[in-house]
């Protein structure tokens, strides 16, 4: 169905607040829960005594996730000169605990969504862009007084709102995908307004994919900087809570 949510009266109400959007999304649509494996990884990362062996064992329960982590560890991006024969070696020798945990968390989390693989906004390009932003955020983090691992996670997960849009509203997502292909220089916000924001301000997605992602991350109880970086990364000139993480993601997006 169409995603416009109409309020009572003559259609002249002001645009929905973010709290109203969150409330309507949760009442009207079945928002995907965080997948069980992603939740287990998130809990492990919150444990300061967790070991590389525990992380490797958790990942190795999932053959597909294991293969993807091994592929990243062997990729030219990290340029490790030796052999990598196990997930534990990927953790201890190449990628480090935080990076493996965060990549695994991202990979496990995207399984919550059914989104096309292809197209400029498809899953393949989504991952390429997310990993690139995460890598840049990790480099930028020390210069911003931010924590590197958390910066990486902010970069990796900042665009999850796009996946939720694609999952809940496939027809509109296809239209947005085509618009993006035809207008690569346009801002995502302006393209989203063309697809979602044409009525009287009552369209729940007119707040943009960033805010939608922030709502999902808050529901999934991800760390506050991750929620904020996703939620406001489309707002230029943002000043407020976790500003350094937001600016980092915005800079990585622009590079």
Give the location of each predicted region.
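Conserved alpha-helical "signature site"
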Residues: 1-255
